[in-house]
């Protein structure tokens, strides 16, 4: 099952509302899911999104939107989402593939 929360514009003001908690997040270029990542309690969803917003990752520099989901097991949930994407599209999201 994909991330259940809606997509938000990837702006500093919107990211400031993201949680300081563990979970998973997705980055989008328009309607295309380009990256799925996880956040631990030490590197929260908000912190991870701010990192991407600062354009520190070349592949996600064009990301326009994000979504997130809290999870007690972010690594497991990340794998579930990626496996669902692969089952549907036959490949990883482009920025996950670049990171592999």
What is the predicted role of each segment?
Residues 1-44, 69-83, 100:
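GIY-YIG nuclease catalytic motif and its immediate N-terminal context
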Residues 37, 57-59, 95:
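Short cysteine clusters
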Residues 45-56:
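A broadly used, surface-exposed interaction patch
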Residues 48-49, 61, 93:
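Short linear functional motifs in flexible/disordered or boundary regions
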Residues 57, 86-89:
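Secondary-structure transition/hinge residues
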Residues 57-71:
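Basic nucleic-acid-binding interfaces
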Residues 88-100:
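Coupling/hinge elements of helicase-like and P-loop NTPase modules
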């Amino acid at each position: 099952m994909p991330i259940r929360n809606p997509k938000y514009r990837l702006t500093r003001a919107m990211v400031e509302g993201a949680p300081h908690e563990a979970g998973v997040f997705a980055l989008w270029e328009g309607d295309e899911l380009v990256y799925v990542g996880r956040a631990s309690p030490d590197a929260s969803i908000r912190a991870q999104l701010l990192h991407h917003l600062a354009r520190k990752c070349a592949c996600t520099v064009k990301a326009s939107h994000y979504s997130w989901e809290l999870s007690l097991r972010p690594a497991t949930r990340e794998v579930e989402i990626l496996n669902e994407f692969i089952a549907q599209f036959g490949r990883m999201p482009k920025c996950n593939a670049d990171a592999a």
